[in-house]
Amino acid sequence: GGGRYRDEYASYPVIMLDFTAAASRDGAGAAAAIRGAVVRECARLLPLLAAPDLSRREVRLIERAARGVASDKEIDAALGVLIKLLQAAFDEQVVLLIDDYDAVCPKRLDAKDDGSVDSLESLSRMLFDTIADAGDSLRLTCLMCERPGHAEFALSQRGVSYRSATALSSWCDRWFGFSDDEVQVLLDCIGRNGCLDDAREWLEGYLLGGFYCSSPERVVAPTSVNGWRSILTERAEGPSPIMMSS
């Protein structure tokens, strides 16, 4: 399937949200870009929700989002529903990766939703409410950002434990380690066979091609390689953590 990987260790469904497109926008434009990222993940992962025992009402919500006919309210609910459906479909916890979250951080995460806050602030609260409510449904949540302070505040307000990590930390390597064989398969797909060392560093959260890149799809997706599946392979047992990578 398009969002799952299996090897001798373990495998988990992966949701990847890239908010980079929202970085240059404000207010409603940024909120639309965030919802667009959720819609694209609904479309990408919809084929994995074919199990007959899943809630048809919830699957229809994801279908509406994937077709681009869902309301903003439905899209805002889609992430939590997607986590629930993926866990039920594969009987596994879900991995949630969010890239460039801080590019659209609202100014007041502690503001009350009394009509005075804009849609971006409401979306931010919705995102962290979803993470908190998902609980044990999430194996790992990784918020990749330059300024983790907003995420730390939001998580602490909800009583959610987290751990900050730099890209070079051994803790990050433990969760995001890839075998040389896995790295070589990706390189073969994109015609970079001789770049094993560089690619290995990138896949553990470093650099590839001289620029920072934290989402595998940014390198692989443009080649439309059918063999690539969104992947996070875990080699260590432990609690479900939240990580902010700076």
Model-derived regions, located:
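Amphipathic alpha-helical segments of the small helical/lid subdomains adjacent to P-loop NTPase cores
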Residues: 151-160, 165-230
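Conserved P-loop NTPase "ATPase switch" module shared by AAA+ and STAND
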Residues: 90-117
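Structural recognition of the conserved hydrophobic beta-strand(s) that form the central parallel beta-sheet
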Residues: 95-99, 126, 139-146
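P-loop NTPase motor core
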Residues: 1-48
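Short glycine-/polar-rich loops that comprise or flank the Walker A/P-loop
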Residues: 10-14, 137-139, 162-170
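Short glycine-rich substrate-engagement loop in P-loop NTPases that contacts/grips substrate
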Residues: 65-83
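Substrate-engagement module of ASCE P-loop NTPases
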Residues: 42, 78-90, 116-139
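Conserved nucleotide-binding/hydrolysis micro-motifs of P-loop NTPases
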Residues: 20-24, 102-103, 146-153, 232-235
